[in-house]
């Protein structure tokens, strides 16, 4: 048996759990907090008002794009002089990543690049992060349970991670009601990101029995729930996708990812496309590459299981499942990576950059530059 361990925060998952935000804040002991939030929708504003009634809010930061180094530096300059004992993040993956990065870097003593992977030294944080509470409003990235924050570095055209086990939130509050009535295109992109983050750890060279037990349960359920949500809004399917998202976050944090996420960082930095849409456009092509190059008998069985789950959710024959998935995603409105802004001339650059990605290190097979280029060309 492979060695197994899980690093996870305290997780509370329940429809309506955010109605208890005040008691949770008192339990944690926050007195002066920064709120990091996305677009202030009614549900988000309701939570913010509840927070304001029980603690002092020193700043509110609104996040509308994936965190970038220049924006992060601006917020750090403003916050380092404030007396803060907690942070609360309410939003999607970009919001949670911004809060996570700020929680770690506000107490840090050195330059930001000291702690960044790939473009920096990748050193551990020299001080404990500010405790924070994660309240995701989308079911996608799983950032509420991961120990890294993804930061865009425009000058390097790379997205890299700030990574430290202490970046996990003090508690993650998973309230599926916050995702109700999410627009279809957001549901699709976030949902396929979440499913990818369950599938890639299932095939990862770092997979463990613990993460296997988690993702095997939710991949088939997630595929059916996401398919349903493209035509019908139901609370039960929203609840399922919230579970898929948090499960994918736990799995990737403990077993790694693979080729789809290996591409996602460089491709996103080059094109500016949303992370979930990139994962959606690449998932079927990444799976085809695994089927073509994986020889490990155990992984071959797992790939066949994925084909079966896809056929159950989407119809068709298991042997055609990856093509069926690709066609279904396109029919739902996410076309190839060319539609996201990638040109054929940029493909070699993205392929080469992806090879140094932390996500690619867990891919079940080593893929050389020529193969990576071919995958991207087929995904155009």
Task: Label each PLM-derived region with a short phrase.
Residues 1-86:
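ATP/NTP phosphate-donor binding region
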Residues 205-214, 229-240, 255-260, 297, ...:
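Flexible, glycine/charged-enriched surface loops at secondary-structure junctions
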């Amino acid at each position: 048996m492979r060695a197994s361990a899980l690093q996870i925060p305290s997780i509370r998952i329940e429809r309506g759990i955010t109605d208890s935000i005040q008691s949770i804040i008192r339990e944690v002991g926050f007195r002066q907090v920064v709120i990091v939030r996305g677009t202030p929708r009614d549900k988000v504003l309701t939570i913010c008002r509840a927070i304001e009634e029980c603690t002092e809010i020193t700043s509110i930061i609104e996040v509308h794009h994936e965190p970038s180094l220049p924006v992060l530096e601006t917020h750090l300059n403003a916050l380092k002089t404030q007396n803060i004992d907690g942070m609360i993040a309410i939003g999607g993956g970009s919001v949670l990543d911004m809060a996570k990065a700020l929680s770690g870097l506000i107490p840090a003593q050195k330059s930001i690049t000291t702690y960044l992977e790939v473009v920096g030294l990748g050193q551990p944080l020299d001080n404990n992060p500010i405790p924070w509470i994660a309240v995701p409003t989308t079911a996608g990235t799983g950032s509420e349970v991961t120990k890294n924050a993804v930061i865009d570095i425009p000058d390097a055209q790379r997205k890299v991670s700030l990574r430290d086990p202490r970046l996990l939130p003090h508690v993650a509050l998973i309230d599926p009601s916050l995702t109700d009535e999410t627009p279809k295109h957001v549901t699709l992109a976030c949902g396929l990101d979440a499913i990818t983050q369950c599938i890639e750890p299932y095939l990862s060279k770092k997979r463990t029995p613990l993460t296997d037990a988690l993702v095997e349960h939710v991949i088939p359920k997630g595929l059916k729930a996401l398919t349903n949500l493209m035509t019908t809004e139901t609370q039960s399917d929203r609840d399922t996708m919230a579970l898929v998202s948090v499960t994918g976050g736990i799995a990737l944090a403990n077993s790694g990812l693979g080729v789809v996420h290996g591409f996602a960082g460089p491709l996103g930095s080059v094109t500016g496309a949303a992370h979930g849409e990139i994962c959606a456009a690449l998932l079927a092509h990444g799976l085809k590459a695994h089927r073509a190059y994986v020889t490990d008998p155990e992984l071959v069985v797992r790939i066949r299981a994925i084909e079966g789950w896809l056929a159950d959710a989407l119809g068709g024959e298991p042997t055609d499942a990856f093509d069926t998935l690709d066609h279904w995603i396109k029919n739902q409105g996410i076309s190839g990576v060319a539609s996201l802004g990638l040109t054929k001339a940029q493909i070699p650059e993205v392929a080469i950059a992806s090879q140094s990605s932390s996500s690619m290190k867990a891919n079940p097979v080593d893929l050389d530059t020529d193969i990576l280029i071919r995958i991207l060309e087929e995904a155009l």
